[in-house]
A protein has these predicted regions:
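Phosphate/pyrophosphate-binding loop motifs in nucleotide- or prenyl diphosphate-using proteins
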Residues: 4, 11-205
Length: 205
């Protein structure tokens, strides 16, 4: 997975004195100065491309979840949030790979799968067991932790909309990408409510 992340960022590895070694990540590559970015396993597209918008929004969600995780004190919830972050790296990797090159992701098990969807469903159900969710909209903002998670939820929803557009235009074929993001935003919503479970929900009447 680290190899995939480094390739997304155009990081470089090198050989030093005949031994395999990694240099410090090269942040400034200048390869994107013309407004394009490299995809995994080959190909370059404009940074304004719909595919880049999709995995860029995933990046926003991952970073937002990182802030939420830093605010959360409950170790179980922190672990769940980190699981979401790591899963979203896999989502980003698949979005950053053209369909003809997807087999290379499959070989390393770095594709979104039914098992990932099921895992998120199970995590959601486990948290819901301890909740009495209101049948109404909840106004975000009852705690810093839940507020951060709610921002993450909206970013995951935004990413889902971008991915739906890619799917409808046949740029991606894996429907589990859509299913995963839909479930992930559900999980984020439940996490937010779980964090505030000791307080009365601020419902929109």
């Amino acid at each position: 997975m680290q190899k995939l992340i480094s390739r997304i960022s155009d990081y470089n590895t090198s050989m030093d004195n005949g031994k395999s070694a990694k240099k410090s990540a090269k942040i400034t590559t200048k390869t994107g100065d013309n407004g394009t970015t490299g995809l995994l396993f080959g190909g370059r597209v404009l940074k304004s491309d719909a595919r880049v918008e999709a995995f860029g929004t995933i990046d926003e969600a991952v970073s937002s979840l990182g802030l939420a995780r830093a605010l959360i004190s409950d170790p179980e919830v922190k672990s769940i949030v980190e699981t979401l972050q790591r899963d979203l790296f896999i989502v980003a990797a698949e979005l950053a790979t053209l369909e003809p090159n997807r087999d290379q992701l499959v070989e390393t098990n770095n594709v979104v799968s039914e098992s990932m969807v099921q895992k998120v469903e199970e995590l959601t159900d486990s948290l819901k067991e301890n909740l009495n969710l209101p049948n109404a909209f909840v106004v975000p903002g009852d705690s810093p932790e839940s507020s951060a998670i709610d921002v993450s939820r909206t970013l995951i929803r935004k990413a889902e909309r971008r991915v739906v557009a890619l799917y409808e235009n046949k740029h991606i074929a894996n429907r589990d990408l859509l299913r995963y993001l839909n479930r992930a935003s559900d999980l984020a919503y439940v996490i937010g409510r779980y964090l505030d479970r000791e307080k009365p929900f601020n419902k929109l009447n």
